[in-house]
Amino acid sequence: MKRRLFFSCCCLLFLMAGCDQGKPKEIDVKLHNASGDEVGTAKVAQQTSGVKITIKAEGFTPGPHGIHVHEIGECKAPSFESSGNHFNPDNKKHGLLNPKGAENGDLPNVVADGSGKIKAEIDAPHIKLEEGKTTIHRKDGASIIITENADDGMTQPTGKSGGRIACGVIVKKASDLKKK
């Protein structure tokens, strides 16, 4: 009798584990520079409110750099323009200092230390891995872009943050997933 109960409980746990196989709760992203070299990683993890993005990268000019989540999961070097604009399903204006609220993909600047290394943890409360309006699991996917200069938090449309110097695909475009 105990064996049957144990077996039944194991089967139930196995079935319940399969029910939570929807969207991932964490995504590892490889960051590449304009030459195609891997320069680091970003980990995007679902939290109670939004996501936490953990960046570990190197090879950057020391000082502050803008970082944003972009609306397309594609990183065609060298310009990374294929990643589109900032992720913005709430249709806000650019800038964390914007009094009417920022775009969903606007993030605080990251800082490269004297040796060009970036280590940062960023809370992104207006982005989700889970279902909903602000999910980055969409047909166009999403990407992370690091820019050559700091984002000033206000200037439209990109905060005077300069060119895109690193990119990583968080979620691929649906059309790219079908090609595999």
Residue ranges and their predicted role:
Residues 1-7:
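Bacterial N-terminal signal peptides that target proteins for export
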Residues 11-12:
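Repetitive helical segments and hydrophobic/amphipathic motifs
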Residues 19-64, 69-180:
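N-terminal leader/targeting pre-sequences
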